[in-house]
Amino acid sequence: KLNMSTEQKITCSNIWKLFGPDEKRIIKNLDKSLSIKEVQEKTGHVVAVKDVSFSIQKGETFVVMGLSGSGKSTLVRCISRLIEPTSGTVKMDDIDVTKMSNSQLLDLRRNKMSMVFQHFGLFPHRTVLENIGYGLEIRGSKKDMRVDKSMEVLKMVGLDGWQNNYPRELSGGMQQRVGLARALAVDPEILIFDEPFSALDPLIRREMQDELLKIQEKLQRTMVFITHDFLEAIKMGDHIAIMKDGEVSQVGTPEEIVANPKDQYVKDFCEDVPKYKVLSAGKVMRTDCCDETKNLFSKKTDCIMDNLKIETLIDKLVDSDKSYPVVCNETGDLLGEIDRSIVICLLYTSDAADECDSV
């Protein structure tokens, strides 16, 4: 979705979170090969996050998804230290967040990080503008600066003209826009979203997703986005971490996960995904090319870049009975061929990526 930096903004290493009266002692002597159920039976402690490691690049949207109880919200709260991890490290810009003092942590949350929750948490006695400027207010910013910045982000989220209204006068979707604007007003480097749109009606939810994608395209902040909805995950995320029982089952781009689900749990999530919207020509092409395709390639005619999504090629391919050469976006080399039989397979089969290999 974005041209992300290769710089790592957030790095999580071997994060564990146990809930119980003696978690620090238990983790030191814990047999890490035990299942969550076995740990609870042997120690009386509940494992919410189990040995999770991943990195998030600067400027990307990293989605953490899973079913209720999978540990996704607990994990993200460990990243921000709203919950203290039992063991492991969280680094932001190579600074160990788990070793920060309370004052350092407060400074991090005021100046570098913002969070948007499912429940908006707006102050009912404050106007929209005053709610948006709250983070700047506790930071100590002057009133003129707060008003100017709040008006700027108010327009960014599509609420221009509502600055003097109160939260009770706004719809749920509008209130969530205020919550988003409040998070953006402090110019955070990192934005954390905990199922921000799950309580909204489907149409409003889609509007908010599109709004956030536009904002991200403009600002290119590092975003961590929690959801239980796989369709939302593939729409919003540059990378997705899928969680089950406190562990990360698979991390990858939406295309990598849909094309090559690691196990049945991940495959079940991919079941209803419109694969033609996720997969690119390079993922579903045939690597053996016919003479006609080779001839087209030699003439540099009708070549299709390997990174183009099938969704953008449907009209071209379905209306033609010929095969098209698929070329590498970076080098221009011939990689394979694609034709309408592959597109039709993607449109009408559930395990499209697998079945198209045999077309």
Q: What is the meaning of each model-derived region?
A:
Residues K28-E38, I95-D96, E137, D144-G161:
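Conserved ABC ATPase "signature" region
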Residues S80:
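Helix-to-loop junction immediately C-terminal to a conserved catalytic motif
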Residues G88-D96:
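Conserved ABC transporter NBD signature motif
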Residues Y166-L170, M174:
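Conserved ABC ATPase signature
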Residues A185-E189:
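A short, proline-enriched helix->beta-strand linker immediately N-terminal to the Walker B motif
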Residues D245-G246:
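Conserved ABC ATPase "signature" C-loop
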Residues Y348-A353:
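Conserved small/polar residues in nucleotide/adenosyl-binding loops
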